[in-house]
Amino acid sequence: MERIKELRNLMSQSRTREILTKTTVDHMAIIKKYTSGRQEKNPSLRMKWMMAMKYPITADKRITEMIPERNEQGQTLWSKMSDAGSDRVMVSPLAVTWWNRNGPMTSTVHYPKIYKTYFEKVERLKHGTFGPVHFRNQVKIRRRVDINPGHADLSAKEAQDVIMEVVFPNEVGARILTSESQLTITKEKKEELQDCKISPLMVAYMLERELVRKTRFLPVAGGTSSVYIEVLHLTQGTCWEQMYTPGGEVRNDDVDQSLIIAARNIVRRAAVSADPLASLLEMCHSTQIGGTRMVDILRQNPTEEQAVDICKAAMGLRISSSFSFGGFTFKRTSGSSVKREEEVLTGNLQTLKIRVHEGYEEFTMVGKRATAILRKATRRLIQLIVSGRDEQSIAEAIIVAMVFSQEDCMIKAVRGDLNFVNRANQRLNPMHQLLRHFQKDAKVLFQNWGIEHIDNVMGMIGVLPDMTPSTEMSMRGVRVSKMGVDEYSSAERVVVSIDRFLRVRDQRGNVLLSPEEVSETQGTEKLTITYSSSMMWEINGPESVLVNTYQWIIRNWETVKIQWSQNPTMLYNKMEFEPFQSLVPKAIRGQYSGFVRTLFQQMRDVLGTFDTTQIIKLLPFAAAPPKQSRMQFSSLTVNVRGSGMRILVRGNSPVFNYNKTTKRLTILGKDAGTLTEDPDEGTSGVESAVLRGFLILGKEDRRYGPALSINELSNLAKGEKANVLIGQGDVVLVMKRKRDSSILTDSQTATKRIRMAIN
């Protein structure tokens, strides 16, 4: 107060006013503030007073020879004064206009290539459709979004190397282009930019736009893919939204969308296999999305989604430190807790062992259609503020928060037994049991929760157990807000560990993700996903499993044949036969397997009964753990097309049909490939022809190593001996001839010799 009086007093004296308004600014601190550093302190003011001058622009001296001194209107374009501090001349803004209208033209061929992202944007906007404007309250939440459509997904460092290599190829400096995408892009751009006259700096800027994902943390209601974000200013305001359909898609959005679908399919499939983690890795490494290896995409793509993050964790990549529960991303914003095991009783007197979080904590919850702020203490919900698109979404968020709070009244609201299982038929953990139970029906939960009178708070409203809004009453601690809750902004990534059941933990041991959190939503991928792993054969149903299994045997017949005769157990345990088991009726799997294995053993023991077609046909059945029984079968059943279909042990059937003349195999009418050798011609044809140049010495001799296939014989040196597997599944010892002259007689004697060696 005293200071203010004093200042008023000073200002009333005319001399003070004069000093303050007339004296020059020569205080060192002020001069320092406006002159130190390269950063302009008041850019708009600087621009205004610069442009008010007659010659605010400097240009190279050569410009005076290229531009007249005055334009058609007689206005001066450049000054005879040179710029202080450089050897450039001062020019008027009118000079720029003259240059743009009358200056030299250059080739424009490179413009669409360099400014590709801009040209494509114009096309998208031209073909996009803008719908009506609606006036309504916009629940926007800040999300990290991709702001530049049409980019590749290189890291900043990778992009920098590519740009240097393309724009300044002769500059020194270590550049290592390693990834597939780096090499492809570099080659492509170098070809595109031959004889390009656009300034290298501009080219570098534009390349960066094309190669690197740029993200911003922006308030969004609605679509978050980059083709919507580029028109954010046109589609949503504070109280209005305009409908818009993009006029084109961009690859980066398609990659994100397809990656999520592939990851979900892979995690779901891995969760039900014997070793989920190993299976998941095997599938990630053998899958391609739009022709790019999935593991390469995972390394570069920052998409945060539960399944994608599980795949990243398995590959040892860092992921976000937030955790997932009930499809919501939780981020603790304050407080802390310790965990303790506690046994609780449900309303049905079932005992559950839950890990209780003791302590006060605050969380933000962000879901696809609803967001919330949650404050909780040990097994008690203090406050939940929810906002969402509709009643259904708000209810989902409330259920998740109530279960997460671990309150007793929630556990007591359970009616009936909790016995939910995951895809692998294992019981879910207690927290997910509770979640599933209430997601099915939350009526009792909401009724038992309790209600309270509420104060009138701006922008907040109560919600009753039947989900109707109210200004007087609300479920205890629960309020609905008009404002959304922002997504967690930090892009920090943390080191995590993953166990064999795909549970992802942070370094303090908190579970961040588990397969239960992976969405069951099915979608159609925008880019082709190629799963090479046999584990994914079943994604397209039983028929695909059947066709793929037999195709695999035929493609690998050479090695399968050797294993069949020498190491059958190893062959039966191959993972490629795993999907097939789901087609065989459970009750009879073991008997089928025992029967087929016995049959195969007889084939090995009784010479000349080797039958390729039959081995291929029955092999997948031998993969199940065998039951010893004396049962004989003339046909084996597989469940496809919604019913049991029969595969005949001897002969063709609609399921498995081998055509001797064309040597083609059809499975359920679909082509499954050609057999390279005819199963029924005995040894005479193939073997005698192939064994030209080899002398048959007699029966198999183990000292010469495992049996080679006929194709592998060509690698032998002259005089070298080896065991070789011939058509009947029999093994004989051969030696490569030292001279070529006697080759002709081989084919005649081979047939006789083979018979002798075998018998």
Curated annotation (Swiss-Prot):
Keywords: Cap snatching, Eukaryotic host gene expression shutoff by virus, Eukaryotic host transcription shutoff by virus, Host gene expression shutoff by virus, Host mitochondrion, Host nucleus, Host-virus interaction, Inhibition of host innate immune response by virus, Inhibition of host MAVS by virus, Inhibition of host RLR pathway by virus, Inhibition of host RNA polymerase II by virus, mRNA capping, mRNA processing, Viral immunoevasion, Viral transcription, Virion
InterPro entries: Flu_PB2_2nd, Flu_PB2_6th, Flu_PB2_C, Flu_PB2_CAP-bd, Flu_PB2_middle, Flu_PB2_N, INV_PB2, PB2_helical
Any Gene Ontology biological process: symbiont-mediated suppression of host cytoplasmic pattern recognition receptor signaling pathway via inhibition of MAVS activity
Site residues, Mammalian adaptation: 627
GO cellular component terms given for this protein: host cell mitochondrion; host cell nucleus; virion component
Transmembrane segments: none
Homology family: Belongs to the influenza viruses PB2 family.
Protein name (database record): Polymerase basic protein 2
Organism: Influenza A virus (strain A/Leningrad/134/1957 H2N2)
Lineage of the organism: Viruses, Riboviria, Orthornavirae, Negarnaviricota, Polyploviricotina
